[in-house]
């Protein structure tokens, strides 16, 4: 792991020549460089070398939001988690920002006000790529407040602010994942009205809370997972949301017994000498 940079304020950051990339640009650039080295892009994922992984590489290079569609145990979530390895090691954020504001391009009122007050003396901190992964399991009880946020009426009253003012919002998981990868597992389980709330974020990069529209250009890489069996058992993905997901990647079970045995060997935790894994010797 690269050492954490020692730059502590905006002046030093500007002097270093640092330039900002969006999350999708980061992933695309780093994947392109990795492919050129000839190293495996997603190591220890067996059976997908000529199917899923090339599709995933194309989706990342195309800067698409991604949906993994497949049955249980097909490494959908594992692949999603491995994508963080393609992020830059460290990125700067404005110290104290709830939504990981970029010091060179803040999007929240907090970030803009801090820079207006402190200028080049604005304090920054560094965020490691391992902290840039957010994951939410879609369940029927998930609400818009959980994902996007809600108006805090107490804060609005105490500060005498309009409900349309960004400062009265309690941000949900998605805004807090700004400049990160956000994974929603089992997307069909998410209620249709909750899926609808994602439209403007995916397309216009706006968030809408209780009818108030705020132009906050969030920078996110969305990854979804879905099981086709869930379409009949519990729910479905609404069509307009499908249209906003750039790439749908179909996963599958191993095509050969040798690959299946290799995966079983990798996933088994056989430590005691008296345990015999007969499948490997079939």
For each feature predicted by the language model, list its residue ranges:
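Conserved AAA+ ATPase "sensor/coupling" helix adjacent to the nucleotide-binding pocket
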Residues: 150-154, 260-274
């Amino acid at each position: 792991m690269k050492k954490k940079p020692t730059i502590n304020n905006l002046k030093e950051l500007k002097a270093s020549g640092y330039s900002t990339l969006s999350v999708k640009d980061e992933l695309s650039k780093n994947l392109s460089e990795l492919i050129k080295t000839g190293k495996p892009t997603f190591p220890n994922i067996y059976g997908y070398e000529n199917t899923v992984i090339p599709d995933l590489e194309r989706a990342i290079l195309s800067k698409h939001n991604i949906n993994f569609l497949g049955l249980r145990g097909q490494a959908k979530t594992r692949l999603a988690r491995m994508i963080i390895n393609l992020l830059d090691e460290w990125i700067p954020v404005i110290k104290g920002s709830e939504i990981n504001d970029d010091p060179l391009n803040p999007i929240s009122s907090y970030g803009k006000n801090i820079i207006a007050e402190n200028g080049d003396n604005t304090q920054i901190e560094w965020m490691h790529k391992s902290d840039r992964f957010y994951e939410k399991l879609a369940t029927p009880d998930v609400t818009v407040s959980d994902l996007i946020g809600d108006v805090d009426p107490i804060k609005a009253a105490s500060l005498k602010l309009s409900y349309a003012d960004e400062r009265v919002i309690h941000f949900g998981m998605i805004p807090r994942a700004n400049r990160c990868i956000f994974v929603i597992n089992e997307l069909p389980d998410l209620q249709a009205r909750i899926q609808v709330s994602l439209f403007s974020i995916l397309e216009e990069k706006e968030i809408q809370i209780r009818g108030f529209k705020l132009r906050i250009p969030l920078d996110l890489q969305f990854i979804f997972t879905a099981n086709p069996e869930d379409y009949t058992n519990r729910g479905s993905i609404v069509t307009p949301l499908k249209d906003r997901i750039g790439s749908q990647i179909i996963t599958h079970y191993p095509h050969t017994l040798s690959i299946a045995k290799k995966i079983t060997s990798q996933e088994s935790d056989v430590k005691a000498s008296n345990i015999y894994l007969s499948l490997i010797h079939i």
